[in-house]
């Protein structure tokens, strides 16, 4: 298999991290933005942009409100998919897999690294629920600011999700739409990866 150059390597997470590092100085903003897909109880898909915060040795991590629609759908199905797409590189990575919570020390550390206003905002926002007005949201921000001051703890309803892939596809633009695609797949998280080149 002619998997060389930007596709070379035996570790798909290392390849993904390398592509992201390459995109960071070139994308106009948010090179770590992913389009995260879930399905509701009726099987109707939902997709939204969130920020990928970590590429681990065996997983991808993002953070959110556990009461949000995305979180409810993830915890109902235990599965999610996302795509990372970079116009500057003309490349993308697609991921499908199983999801688990990250609500321990790692989530605490990431929450603590955020700006104070973002930490207070996590307390103030009942994410995905109806909101009467922006004024009422700002009033809630003022209330939690008065309550916590400059040291708000991480809310129990806010934390991370770790996506452990069963499938990762790397795609790069090719001339005349003769793109390069390589798919890594495994049947379970304990299995090794099989790799195949796909038609454009």
From Swiss-Prot:
InterPro entries according to UniProt: Pyridox_Oxase, Pyridox_Oxase_CS, Pyridox_Oxase_N, Pyridoxamine_oxidase_dimer_C, Split_barrel_FMN-bd
EC number: 1.4.3.5
Residues the record lists as binding substrate: 53, 110, 114, 118, 177-179
Note on how the cofactor is bound: Binds 1 FMN per subunit.
Pfam families noted in UniProt: PNP_phzG_C (PF10590), PNPOx_N (PF01243)
Protein's UniProt keywords contain Flavoprotein: yes
Cofactor(s) for this UniProt protein: FMN
Alphabetized Gene3D superfamilies for the sequence: Electron Transport, Fmn-binding Protein, Chain A (2.30.110.10)
MF (Gene Ontology): FMN binding; pyridoxamine phosphate oxidase activity
UniProt keyword Oxidoreductase present: yes
Keywords per UniProt: Flavoprotein, FMN, Oxidoreductase, Pyridoxine biosynthesis
Gene Ontology biological process terms, A to Z: pyridoxine biosynthetic process
Catalysis performed (reactions): pyridoxamine 5'-phosphate + O2 + H2O = pyridoxal 5'-phosphate + H2O2 + NH4(+); pyridoxine 5'-phosphate + O2 = pyridoxal 5'-phosphate + H2O2
Residues at which FMN binds: 48-53, 63-64, 70, 92, 127-128, 171, 181
Pathway(s) it belongs to: Cofactor metabolism; pyridoxal 5'-phosphate salvage; pyridoxal 5'-phosphate from pyridoxamine 5'-phosphate: step 1/1; Cofactor metabolism; pyridoxal 5'-phosphate salvage; pyridoxal 5'-phosphate from pyridoxine 5'-phosphate: step 1/1
Family: Belongs to the pyridoxamine 5'-phosphate oxidase family.
The protein's assembly and partners: Homodimer.
Main function: Catalyzes the oxidation of either pyridoxine 5'-phosphate (PNP) or pyridoxamine 5'-phosphate (PMP) into pyridoxal 5'-phosphate (PLP).
NCBIfam families (UniProt xref): pdxH, PRK05679.1
PANTHER family reported for this sequence: PYRIDOXINE-5'-PHOSPHATE OXIDASE (PTHR10851:SF0), PYRIDOXINE-5-PHOSPHATE OXIDASE (PTHR10851)
Name assigned to this protein: Pyridoxine/pyridoxamine 5'-phosphate oxidase
Species assigned in the record: Cereibacter sphaeroides (strain ATCC 17023 / DSM 158 / JCM 6121 / CCUG 31486 / LMG 2827 / NBRC 12203 / NCIMB 8253 / ATH 2.4.1.)
Lineage, opening ranks: Bacteria, Pseudomonadati, Pseudomonadota, Alphaproteobacteria, Rhodobacterales
């Amino acid at each position: 298999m002619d998997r060389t150059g930007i596709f070379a390597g035996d570790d798909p997470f290392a390849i993904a991290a390398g592509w992201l590092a390459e995109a960071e100085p070139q994308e106009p903003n948010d090179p770590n933005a992913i389009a995260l897909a879930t399905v509701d109880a009726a099987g109707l898909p939902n997709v939204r942009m969130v920020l990928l915060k970590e590429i681990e040795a065996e997983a991808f991590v993002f953070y959110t409100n556990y009461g949000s629609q995305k979180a409810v759908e993830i915890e109902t199905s235990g599965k999610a998919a996302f795509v990372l797409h970079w116009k500057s590189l003309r490349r993308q990575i697609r991921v499908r897999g199983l999801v688990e919570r990250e609500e321990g020390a790692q989530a605490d550390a990431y929450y603590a690294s955020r700006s104070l206003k973002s930490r207070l905002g996590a307390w103030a926002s009942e994410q995905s629920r109806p909101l009467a007005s922006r004024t009422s949201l700002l009033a809630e921000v003022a209330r939690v600011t008065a309550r916590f001051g400059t040291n708000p703890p991480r809310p129990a309803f806010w934390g991370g999700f770790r996506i452990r892939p069963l499938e990762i596809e790397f795609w790069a633009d090719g001339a005349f739409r003769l793109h390069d695609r390589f798919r890594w797949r495994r049947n379970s998280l304990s299995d090794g990866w099989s790799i195949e080149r796909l038609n454009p």
